Amino acid sequence: MALLAIIGTACAGLAAVLAAALVALAYRFGLLYQLCHKVDPRSPRHGGELVAEVLKAHGIRFLFTLAGGHISPVLVACEKVGIRVVDTRHEATAVFAADAVSRLSGRIGVAVVTAGPGVTNTVTAVKNAQMAESPVLLIGGAAASLQKGRGALQDIDQLSLFRTLCKVCVSVRTVRDIIPTLRKAIATAQSGTPGPVFVELPIDILYPFHVVEKEVGGTKTPRGLQGKVVQWYLQNYIRNLFAGAWEPRDVSPLPVQVPMATEDEVQRCVELVSRATKPLVLVGSQAMLPPTPAEELR
């Protein structure tokens, strides 16, 4: 009886471990999410449209870029919603221009560059924005998530370049994550001490389903068990990218956390200065927040 109890306990433990492993795998492959959210393979929509919606809702009027294939859907979609797309001759110039717009308008500046060399060319300008405490959103294209580290076109570790320069460095993994990631990044850039943020958008979340399916999933009929397993994995990967992609989501700006002095603190400073015989006031950059657009100062 004791032996049977031990065997039963061991089997129950093994079953629990296997069940936990299966749940973890289902979560890893997005199977649980796909059960509850729709995938529309025939939809002509693409992730660039979601980027444009967020930027438009945040009052962005200008987008600076040097055009590239990885980011083309973003540029096309932004132009369609009325955002002026300014094509520069160098990626650093695009970020410098976004920095200038941010300082003059009081809104976040936006630059969009292609993967690899397009991103690396912006480093000097991003560092300048960091030192100037300018809220700038840098959107960089990237290789498909599935192909990273496998010799894809212009594939490098872009996030490591900006971790010491930007307040946030993040890579978006699915189409449904584009809107919440951009909203949070923009709010972070403008909150506290303003500064640049970097959002990486892999190419497979920016193009329509049928394009990604053709490029990633392939068109040949798989042969053998191994081929069928690989085909299933690729198809599931693509479906997870687009699951719930076009469900309605809030694109409005998140609250910006700007440190403000209380009335008591201001009054205490006034009293100190008024009593001083040789007053010296050291004013930090936070005193300029929230920013006032230049046209309102006329």
Give the ranges of each region predicted by the language model.
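N-terminal alpha/beta PP-like core and its mobile active-site loop of ThDP/TPP-dependent enzymes
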Residues: A2-R298
